[in-house]
Amino acid sequence: MLTAFIICGIICLPCQLKAFATAAENENFARLNNDLQLLIDDNKNGVPGVGAAVIKNGRLVYEKTLGSRYIDNENTQNNLPLTRDTKLRIASLSKVFVAAAYMQLSEEGKIDLDADISRYLGFTLRNPNYPDTPITSKMLLSHTSSLRDGEVYTIPSKYSLQELFRPEGIFYESGAHYAPYGEAPGEFFCYTNLNYGILGTIIEKVTQTRFDKYMKQAIFDPMEIDASFNITDFNEAALSDFGLIYQKQEYGVWNTDGPWIAQVDDYSTLKIYGNNLYNIYNYDEYITGTNATIFFPHGGLRISLAGLEKWMQMLIDNGKYNGKRILTEKSIDEMFKPYWTLNETKTNGDTYSGLMNCFGLGIQNVKNIDKDRFLPDRDIEMSGHFAEAYGLLAGMFIDREHKNGFIYIMNGMSGPESSNSGAYSGMYSWEEKVCSAILNNAFPEL
């Protein structure tokens, strides 16, 4: 069984709650442990692994991981536990890190957030339905760019981003990467992964550094976070410690009573050096500044719960980590400030089934409008980001004013998305259970 780590300053106290906690707090954290365990114990509608962390009043007070990062369906004795150091492909939480790196470049005067991005890309990028309206970095960061994912939004390293946008391009898709007339740049919201592939490419252009290397240099190394957008940064030993992402489906056929089947990061039959895994992720011939989608800036970051905790703490501490300035407070203010809000007639955006009604620069603001809420019976406003891909479900949200925040991660979905919509929100049913457990037990006073 895994242990809960309750943090007092820098001391981890395994197997016990924080020494100065009240009896009520101890009881609440114990109940939270039990609520998370229920998700693991539910063979039909549960998850293979779950992790959670809570910051209250600026201090990390709760951390828990349960379940498995690796499952051997033939012999459960070979299962491996999910831990605070298990790295997972964290999906769209990746975008928050990219946004922060971009804001750093703005602080340095290398990027003007309100300038036409064509200036940085080296080619003109405009929505042909709005040829006179520049697309800016703020529009990319806030998903109001009027660009769309289409069927393909990550393309091989030998191709330039232009192949997505010029009519003769191999990935043009008859203009599917452009919003139609009526969804103007800077006005209409539509959550778009491609925006962050473009941001990653601009980072490369202005720094003359490959995206994955720049992220390590600017973000991960200064914060002592062992994370990367490049799978080849991890040796075979590190890969063996990765957490797999699971679903109870194979080739689109679901069986909720069946086994967990790995969808992502199962490297048990692949070797990173001299074999096909290295060949798959071979960047030797890539030309920096042409197509950073190959690093999946929208969702390809591998990071652990421990790494996410450091990141959440930095945001809560207004840009500082261990005394080092990562972002200015002004930049964090800009990220969290609403850039787009759903209008009263609900005609200026696609709300992602009601989940997204207010967005900043890489940050979603949960405002308890429609299905944009954590709880059915309490309105709790926090800001951060959701994440979902291949079975992973995750979220990180903070209340900057009161220095509170929480993280959750789950590395699998036992049923199809279509059958597991939330009862009261735009989240999935598993997320409603986790968010309810965390907020009702860790933040009953809110």
Q: Where do the language-model regions lie?
A:
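Short active-site loop at a secondary-structure junction
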Residues: K44-G51, E74-M139, P180-L194, F296-G299, ...
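Short, gly/Ser/Thr-rich active-site loops of penicillin-recognizing serine hydrolases
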Residues: F336-N348, S414-L446
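Bacterial N-terminal signal peptides
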Residues: T3-C12
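Short, surface-exposed loop or secondary-structure junction motifs
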Residues: N129-I380
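Short beta->alpha transition motifs characteristic of CBS
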Residues: Y62-Y70, A389-Y390, M410-M413
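Short, well-ordered beta-strand elements
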Residues: L393-D399, K403-S419
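Short, conserved catalytic-motif segment at the N-terminal edge
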Residues: E27-L88, H177-A179
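Sec-dependent signal peptide cleavage junction
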Residues: C12-A23
